[in-house]
């Protein structure tokens, strides 16, 4: 991680000359923040995503709460914070000193969850600073982040069927994903995923009608289904019809269980299940379908239940998203307990590039799988693609192979693989 090894000596060529933020729209038509950072030698632009189902322990995304603009979701306060408070403190600093800049912004905020300046303000600047540094050094972002060790392409875990908060159907589980882990290259993996996606669309239209191919926030189909097994059967059918086997393409679930947890019970498939019953339910699914990973299978504070499922399904990837919120303190607790065995890394959950790297490093040191992730409300920003390669993430989760804000990330990974040439290595799970 080149930008994290000590402080760089001052050089006027790399000093921040100007920072400018603006309000733009995300993929759900809501405002978000975009930040430009200028140096004499380079330029960086970054825009910040937003989640639909969010963990209560995430860093705070600052919204205006003005009902007369965008239903209260404007971000002009966050924009102003960047253009005044943050810019004033960062002008003249060396963009190569990422950690120094991130820590200064965190100190300026003076809260645990970045609620004064806003995690969206801080993250927008943090990402734009990194991009400006890479551009100033005439270096690809993945190489700037990861140095000579950045050559691994992650397995895409593609959300092709949507439920929960990402769709308007009755499926409790939020995401049903395909994982082309048997591919030889990322290029091939993307082709496999796209082929299955289109076969699935035809299957759904034939069985459920044309409206079943309407898509959710992340590009996945949102058919009128009510039970998880119905969705899983459709995925298995599509994988087979596309000409692939269960060893080549596995299935991932994002339960987002906090969203269907109520008064110590989980409402799923028309049933009200206690945690031990839900655990048995997941075990049955894994025994019946080629499921490789389950994300957020329980309520976000249920560390003990995560631990129990991780022990029960020891060869399944149990992912902590709302459980960990990319926070090293919560991740440390999970590691100590053996709760989950994978980290979902979302930079906007924690609010800075440096802290995201810290979480990824802790996860990897402790044998956890790292999955870099988008959010449901995205932009065309591709920073997470470079980040995934830089940290050697085993997987990347950035939606279906559809919708421009999703394919932007996949297409960036294709470019990186091409740039790496023969040294590129596609992860083998």
From Swiss-Prot:
Q: Which cofactor does it need?
A: Mg(2+)
Question: What pathway is this protein a component of?
Answer: Carbohydrate degradation; glycolysis; pyruvate from D-glyceraldehyde 3-phosphate: step 4/5
What InterPro entries has UniProt attached to this entry? Enolase, Enolase-like_C_sf, Enolase-like_N, Enolase_C, Enolase_CS, Enolase_N
Q: Which residues are named in the active-site annotation?
A: 218 (proton donor), 346 (proton acceptor)
**Enzyme Commission code:** 4.2.1.11
Tell me the Gene Ontology biological-process terms attached to this UniProt entry: glycolytic process
Q: Which GO terms describe its cellular component?
A: cell surface; extracellular region; phosphopyruvate hydratase complex
What the entry lists under SUPFAM superfamilies is as follows: Enolase C-terminal domain-like, Enolase N-terminal domain-like
Query: What GO molecular function annotation could you give as one example from this UniProt entry?
Result: phosphopyruvate hydratase activity
Tell me where in or outside the cell this protein is found.
Answer: Cytoplasm; Secreted; Cell surface
Q: Pfam families per the record?
A: Enolase_C, Enolase_N
Q: Please tell me where Mg(2+) binds in this chain.
A: 254, 295, 321
What is the catalytic activity of this protein? (2R)-2-phosphoglycerate = phosphoenolpyruvate + H2O
The yes or no answer to whether the keyword Secreted is present is yes
| UniProt KW keywords | Cytoplasm, Glycolysis, Lyase, Magnesium, Metal-binding, Secreted
Summarizing the function annotation, the protein's role is: Catalyzes the reversible conversion of 2-phosphoglycerate (2-PG) into phosphoenolpyruvate (PEP). It is essential for the degradation of carbohydrates via glycolysis.
Q: Which HAMAP family match?
A: Enolase
Cross-referenced PANTHER family: ENOLASE (PTHR11902:SF1)
Tell me what this protein is called.
Enolase
Please state the gene responsible for encoding this protein: eno
């Amino acid at each position: 991680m080149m930008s994290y090894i000590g402080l760089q000596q001052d050089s006027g060529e790399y000093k921040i000359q100007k920072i400018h933020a603006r309000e733009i729209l995300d993929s759900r038509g809501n405002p978000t923040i975009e930040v430009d950072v200028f140096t004499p030698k380079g330029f960086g632009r970054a825009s910040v995503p937003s989640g639909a189902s969010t963990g209560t322990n995430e860093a705070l995304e600052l919204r205006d709460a003005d009902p007369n603009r965008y239903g209260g979701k404007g971000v002009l306060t966050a924009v102003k914070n960047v253009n005044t408070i943050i810019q004033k403190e960062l002008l003249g600093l060396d963009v190569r000193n990422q950690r120094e800049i991130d820590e200064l912004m965190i100190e300026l905020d003076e809260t645990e969850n970045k609620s004064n300046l806003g995690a969206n303000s801080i993250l927008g600047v943090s990402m734009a600073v990194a991009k400006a540094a890479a551009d100033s050094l005439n270096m690809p972002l993945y190489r700037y982040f990861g140095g000579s060790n950045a050559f691994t392409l992650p397995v895409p875990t593609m959300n092709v069927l949507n439920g929960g908060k990402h769709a308007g159907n009755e499926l409790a589980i939020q995401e049903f994903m395909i994982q082309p882990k048997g591919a030889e290259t990322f290029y091939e993996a993307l082709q496999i995923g796209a082929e299955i996606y289109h076969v699935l669309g035809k299957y759904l239209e034939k069985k459920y009608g044309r409206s079943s191919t309407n898509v959710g926030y992340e590009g996945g189909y949102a058919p009128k289904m009510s039970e998880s097994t119905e969705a899983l059967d459709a995925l298995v059918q599509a994988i087979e019809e596309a000409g692939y086997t269960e060893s080549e393409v596995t299935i991932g679930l994002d339960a987002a269980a906090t969203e269907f947890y109520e008064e110590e019970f989980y409402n799923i498939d028309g049933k009200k299940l206690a945690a031990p019953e839900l655990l048995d339910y997941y075990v049955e699914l894994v025994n019946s379908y080629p499921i490789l990973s389950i994300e957020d299978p329980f309520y976000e504070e249920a560390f003990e239940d995560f631990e129990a499922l991780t022990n029960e399904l020891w060869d399944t990837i149990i992912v902590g998203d709302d459980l960990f919120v990319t926070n090293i303190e919560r991740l440390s607790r999970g590691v100590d307990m053996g709760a989950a065995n994978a980290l979902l890394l979302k930079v906007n959950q924690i609010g800075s590039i440096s802290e995201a790297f810290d979480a990824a490093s802790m996860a990897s040191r402790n044998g956890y799988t790292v999955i870099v992730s988008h959010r449901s409300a995205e932009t065309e920003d591709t920073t997470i693609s470079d980040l995934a390669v830089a940290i050697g993430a085993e997987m990347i989760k950035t939606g279906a192979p559809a919708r421009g804000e999703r394919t932007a990330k996949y297409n960036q990974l294709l470019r990186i693989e091409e740039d790496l040439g023969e040294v590129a290595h596609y992860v083998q799970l």
